[in-house]
């Protein structure tokens, strides 16, 4: 079971912390819905959305709030950020409250949460408009 993340045809989606445990079916579904390949964290142009694969071990290398700020740096107004975390009880699981706190620190709003695959849950975030 893979759900739509809300990305549409022609959108460019940037991916952070993709690894061997990332859900390939979900990644392929995003590419199919946009008609574009996912771009990596080195991509330097404007993007329409971002996917952050986040596990408890990742917190040892980087702060999630800092990573979310990095993800916003290329994000077009109205763009979505999805933070994907292992479901509770899975290796690398992260409390949803940790993601919500990091989002708040980064100036983002949590809009929804969903099961996005057999092993992953997603928290959808939106940025404040740059025009405010």
Model-derived segments and their meaning:
Residues 1-132:
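S-adenosyl-L-methionine-dependent methyltransferase catalytic core, i.e., the SAM/SAH-binding region
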């Amino acid at each position: 079971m893979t759900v739509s993340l809300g990305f549409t045809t022609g959108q460019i989606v940037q991916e952070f912390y993709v690894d061997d445990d990332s859900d390939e079916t979900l990644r392929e579904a995003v590419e199919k819905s946009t008609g574009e390949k996912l771009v990596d964290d080195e991509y330097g142009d404007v993007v329409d959305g971002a996917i952050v694969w986040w596990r408890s071990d990742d917190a040892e290398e980087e702060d999630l709030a800092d990573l979310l700020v990095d993800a916003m740096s290329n994000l077009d107004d109205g763009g979505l950020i999805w933070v994907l975390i292992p479901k509770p009880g899975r290796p690398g699981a992260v409390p949803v409250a940790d993601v919500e706190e990091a989002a708040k620190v980064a100036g983002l709003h949590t809009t929804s949460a969903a099961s996005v695959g057999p092993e992953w849950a997603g928290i959808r975030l939106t940025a404040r408009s740059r025009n405010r």
